[in-house]
Amino acid sequence: MILFPAIDLKDGLAVRLEQGDMDRATVFNRDPASQAGEFEALGFRYLHLVDLNGAFAGHPVNAAAVDRILETVSIPVQLGGGIRDMKTVDGWLEKGVTRVILGTAAVRDPDFVKAAAKAHPGRVVVGLDARDGNVAVQGWAETSNLPAVDIARRFEDAGVSAIIYTDIARDGLLKGLNMDATIALADAVSIPVIASGGLASLADVEALLEPRAKKLAGAITGRALYDGRLDPGAALALVAGRS
């Protein structure tokens, strides 16, 4: 079980959105690289980055901020947002990103995702962001009629390293993870699943460590860390104690 601290990048700043709404952004740190360094110093061993502007634009926008983060930390970094072609995948991996997250492409161009996973074994993650169980794309601006489980099954045996499942309705609202939907997805595929959207407390971390959640590979947390609702030391110790 890995806890991933999240840094969402908007206009070069570290922010958190509520339910994926770019107009409901709270700035938590004007220096994302400094924030990344703080997370590493706290003991987190993997960083989760999202280029929010890039997710809407369809191409990288916050590249300078990502570059500074890569220069600052030594822990692995996974990055999503605006990665829609092989050139962008190759570019980020060459720069030092450990894993790229492909979301919109997983819905609209699954063959590209499979090709990327084949070209870069263990370095491609599928991001499935769901609203009422159906996958949303283009930075959550559009919701498809495709269930997340159906999309996930497309990538069985494709070589993707993980699936990140985000419940948009809970993201940034500190309402707790949608454990039922996330566990159902994990039980439906053989690919490791990472939970996202709503993690708010140590109780949520405890829930991730329950026997019914044994197939979950990790969880992403953002606002709870920034708000001080989740004690990073206690959360990391809890996970380490159960590993």
UniProtKB/Swiss-Prot annotation:
Pathway: Amino-acid biosynthesis; L-histidine biosynthesis; L-histidine from 5-phospho-alpha-D-ribose 1-diphosphate: step 4/9. GO terms for biological process: L-histidine biosynthetic process; L-tryptophan biosynthetic process. GO terms for molecular function: 1-(5-phosphoribosyl)-5-[(5-phosphoribosylamino)methylideneamino]imidazole-4-carboxamide isomerase activity. The keyword NAD does not apply. Gene3D superfamilies: Aldolase class I (3.20.20.70). It is an enzyme of class 5 (isomerase). GO terms for cellular component: cytoplasm. It comes from the Bacteria. Pfam families: His_biosynth (PF00977). Its EC number is 5.3.1.16. The active site is at D8 (proton acceptor), D129 (proton donor). This is 1-(5-phosphoribosyl)-5-[(5-phosphoribosylamino)methylideneamino] imidazole-4-carboxamide isomerase.
